[in-house]
Amino acid sequence: MQEATEPPPPKRKNKGTVVAPKGHGTLQAIDISTNGPVEIKYHLNLPHALEKIMQVNLLTLPTNLTPQRLRTLDSSGLRALVLELRPCRAEVWTCLPRGLVSMTTIETEDGHADADNIVEREVQAPSLNFPLKFLVKGSQVQLIHEVHPVNRCEYCGRLYKHKHECSARRREFYFHHINSHSSNWWQEIQFFPIGSHPRTERLFLTYDVETYTWMGSFGKQLIPFMLVMKLSGDQRLVNIAYDIAMKLKWDRWRQDPQTFYCITPEKMAVGQHFRQYRDQLQTALAVDLWSSFLKANPHMHEWALEHYALTDPTDLTFEELKKLPHVRGTPRFLELYIVGHNINGFDEIVLAAQVINNRAEVPQPFKITRNFMPRAGEILFNDVTFALPNPAYKKRADFQLWEQGACDDIDFKYQFLKVMVRDTFALTHTSLRNAAQAYSLPVEKGCCPYKAVNQFYMLGSYRAEKDGFPLEEYWKDHEEYLLNRELWEKKSQPRYDIIQETLNYCALDVLVTAELVAKLQESYAHFIRDSVGLPHVHFNIFQRPTISSNSHAIFRQIVYRAEKPNRTNLGPGLLAPSHELYDYVRASIRGGRCYPTYIGILEEPLYVYDICGMYASALTHPMPWGTPLNPYERALAVREWQMTLDDPATISYFDKDLLPGIFTIDADPPDEFMLDPLPPFCSRKGGRLCWTNEPLRGEVATTVDLITLHNRGWRVRIVPDELTTIFPEWKCVAREYVQLNIAAKERADKEKNQTMRSIAKLLSNALYGSFATKLDNKKIVFSDQMDESLIKGISAGTVNIKSSSFLETDNLSAEVMPAFEREYLPQQLALLDSDPEDSEDEQRSAPFYTPPAGTPGHVAYTYKPITFLDVEEGDMCLHTVEKVDPLVDNDRYPSHVASFVLAWTRAFVSEWAGFLYEEDRGTPLEDRPIKSVYGDTDSLFVTQRGHELMETKGKKRIKKHGGKLVFDPDEPDLTWLVECETVCVSCGADAYSPESIFLAPKLYALKCIYCPACHKTSKGKLRAKGHAAEALNYELMVNCYLADMQGADRQRFSTSRMSLKRTLASAQPGAHPFTVTETTLTRTLRPWKDRTLAALDAHRLIPYSRSRPNPRNEEVCWIEMP
């Protein structure tokens, strides 16, 4: 029985309207010869169009021009067609990339074509008395019907005949992505999660060196004689490092099996030994990574032999290895950290000529990249990466893991071994002893007499007691001498062994640094998990070199979590100014105040008030957010701003109708009787940053500054400028970051957790600095590490080599010097106190004593002849390269945030000025009482009258009376607090200095601090930047001022201190790369001479104004008179 089949479904009828094909096409483009927009209307059917135009002119096409031939005609056959038709003029419009067209002519009669556009010449009588125009699109040829000019919208770029619709979205897109002039002004900020890979294997090599002074050809050079290192981290990597140390015969410190040392006075010997160890260690780790890669890809042997005739895959290059198919295996990530305290500015430079080696014998398939960046005399980066392909790498589609701050295998293009140098001082900003206390680490009592050690290595002896213990002159003070003597006597040793004692103290410092490394790792990871709220993050504080870079990474992670942009950047809300806009935004970043308004001795009460966490409070205020407006919307916003500024009424900082932006402005001050000693703005027009009451011309300022100037009575005019930037909205972008740190600090205070308090305070203060980071187009590279793009840039002239330096190396000639035959003058041998506890270089010179021969009680030591190696090698060359284009490419820092942070701080100080000086406005400046005598960026020194005004008018801003430190968007208001810094150490009440002396900016002294409540007196305050502060006192500064006023010889008032001159890469002939030399800095002590204020009388200074103009300002400014 057959089954019934289902009938087929009914055939669907197509519905629609049949239309005839279009006969014409339209093309709008820019004519490159006139730079004007044109519209080209052309025929879509070339055979039909040519036939019709011939018929209109009562002509026929040649018989050989068949429709088939014309239909298949391309650009290569166009010339033959024109010569066959011979029109009186033949134009060829060729389509170019990016919406451009060019017009050329094919001449068929001599003298009838444009001489500038002739591409062919053929002298023959025309057969057509009308012109022909052809359009070439790719290889296709069409006949043009007509070409006529059209209009172009300057805001959206659309071409039109009469009118068009210009949408806001199109205007934004055209301004930021199409317009060649402005499309690179703002760049998206790249983002990668803050955490590191969870399977990262780490090895830490913590070290410290001790040096002595050697008189060389480049001055008093510091030479290492001792190096102690400790190994820690993943046990398997520690075992590898341990075996290499034993193989190279490093001495083990008896108190810790993982600590090794090397002692030798030979110049460069310590560096060579350390370099050899570091080279072999990184080679061993690289081989370990390569072995695991080989094991996971056994087919590589056969593939290398088949494609490159290599029996050993180790001979492959990285470019060849990238072509390996079907790469397998789990990627590995190894990190080797070379860590020390305050090594970037000293130890790494001293050792760098020996330890920097670009020829370590790592397997050839690795891609080797180096990130080397010296900055301000320190090695900020010195990282080397050995990379292999990562088989798991792919483009990320889901970004939820990134929002949690974590990453996995697919996010890394390469598996790698990274060798990085890290300085714990850059992460703590304090001495090792202070850092140990801040992070609750045990610290051994006592210290080492480094002055005696230095003298011992220089001369072979030092002054000592009978048992060899250094005399009191080598110690800081009598108490230190007694303490260390007592500690040594407890060891019950017959004689004091200065080398052994130095080794023990150096090793203990290394152990403390190693404990600090572990504590920093653990504490910061805990902070990120608990305080920041990222429990899945494997955070490693040493992944980034400084506290500033870590704070910026935390900030970016918080923004990414909040905004969820689902991309590899922070999205359009927070952009980085670049190229022309970078320089424009940098022009709006103005530093803080620091100058006295009183020179001389002030004999009246003086209180010091300081803003609490000024930058942190400013960061919580609204900042610009979003993609900057296009010129059309920008013009409307500027008009709104100017109308508001023309109204004399007070403007609110938080008016929602006024958008944030950065403008070029002119501003005129009010009448001089209405001016204040604290101007609302500053200018660099005279070459020096001056806080001035003069008219401002062509200054770049934020909208916050416009409000501050307006509310202080200034008349502000916005100057038209194409670089003017206005943002679509305000947003408290950094408020969450600051709140997290403040909450963590308060919680740490309650729990008495000094470690977490230190972390929160450091991170809170570091963020502003990262926004203000200044970039340039310079970089320093090793000659054999120049990549292909850099070499091409140098060849093309887009990159210049500014200077080249060669490193001192160790493998050619040698000079043998018998033991201490050279004679030294005492002044040549001012010794350096190389105490590793001290992170500053402002140390007094040590006393020097030359012992007579055979003096009893001295420790004498005779060295064998010392070998000094001092040569150059051509390939150890550093190049400083710089782009020819001065414009900076920035995709990292939203610099405009720094500009607004500083603008908010100026708003704080402007309100502060209102408390103090509002009652004086209308009175001539010379008749006003003194209310403040010194101003710093975040502090004011006020008199008794100023103190009374702060307790009345400014009461809401004094911290002890309550108040907020974090801006509240629901109740917008300026949010800042101050506290009196001069407080009684006994009862805590506000105290004052009854007498003070002011000589210059950052050069002043308060005689003492007197408490009117309990009538107790405590130590005063002295500030002397650039001087050896321990050599100064209040009486000396008073004598200096009085001598200057009386015309006495002031040269006798000076201070001297020992300083370290660090040279990394320099074009100076007298400075050798990678050396640290010791110099003596002598500074004259005198009152301020090159003042940036005008003198009102013998003591009082006031800002420049119309009646007292800045004599440095010679800039000519055009002003149109109405």
From Swiss-Prot:
GO BP term (any one): viral DNA genome replication
Catalytic reaction(s) noted: DNA(n) + a 2'-deoxyribonucleoside 5'-triphosphate = DNA(n+1) + diphosphate
UniProt keyword Nucleotidyltransferase present: yes
GO cellular component, one term: host cell nucleus
Gene Ontology MF: a single term: nucleotide binding
InterPro entries in the record: DNA-dir_DNA_pol_B (IPR006172), DNA-dir_DNA_pol_B_adenovir (IPR014382), DNA-dir_DNA_pol_B_CS (IPR017964), DNA-dir_DNA_pol_B_mt/vir (IPR004868), DNA/RNA_pol_sf (IPR043502), DNA_pol_palm_dom_sf (IPR023211), RNaseH-like_sf (IPR012337)
HAMAP family, per the entry: ADV_DPOL
Subunit structure: Heterodimer with the terminal protein; this heterodimer binds to bp 9 to 18 of the genome. Forms a complex with viral pTP, DBP and hosts NFIA and POU2F1/OCT1 for initiation of replication.
Name this protein carries in UniProt: DNA polymerase
Lineage: Viruses, Varidnaviria, Bamfordvirae, Preplasmiviricota, Tectiliviricetes
